Amino acid sequence: MRLYLASRSPRRRELLNQIGIDFDTVVFRDGMRADSETDETPLPGEKPVAYVERVARAKAIHGLKIVEERKLPMRPVLSADTTLEFNGEIIGKPVDRADAAAILRRLSGQTHRVLTGVAINHMGHTEYVLSSSEVTFREIDDEEIRHYVMSGEPMDKAGAYGIQGRAGLFVKHLAGSFTGVMGLPVCETGELLKRLGFRPL
């Protein structure tokens, strides 16, 4: 049994492969941000937990629309959304290098929460699960931030860092799911898939 992954993220593809799930990718419009038909702008007063659920569910629904428009075989559509919460504020992907550096300076020496919501749309019904992790950074100096931003790694990632990459050097403590911080919590995703008859591994 195969599913569709509604994401451009190479990390999510890698993690699905890791747990033995067969999938095809349904991508969004070329030349635009991933998930371009999904409004990722936080609503006024929207809490981070509600935000990540809304966006993950919307991505799954939009992925299903792509499947229908292309007249592809009907299968479950999996999507995910990752965001950071710092002092109650939603922190998404940086808009440019200056923004990435500013985000990293804020996170330096602090603890933040990483929320990843996973949604699977199947037969008109959406199942959802949330992974919540706390990450503590050591103090990061300006030179380290400059070098890291120049590497380009922060630019497509919520919170301006990838824990599986060079930013692993900044992580002093992690409480939660490493793969959830990467963008797809494999334990929670596996449990969600089992409800639909998939057998990870």
From Swiss-Prot:
Its cofactor is a divalent metal cation. The record marks R11, T82, Q164 as: Important for substrate specificity. Its EC number is 3.6.1.9. GO terms for biological process: nucleotide metabolic process. The active site is at D81 (proton acceptor). The keyword Cytoplasm applies. PANTHER family: BIFUNCTIONAL DTTP/UTP PYROPHOSPHATASE/METHYLTRANSFERASE PROTEIN-RELATED, BIFUNCTIONAL DTTP_UTP PYROPHOSPHATASE_METHYLTRANSFERASE PROTEIN-RELATED. This is dTTP/UTP pyrophosphatase. It comes from Dechloromonas aromatica (strain RCB).
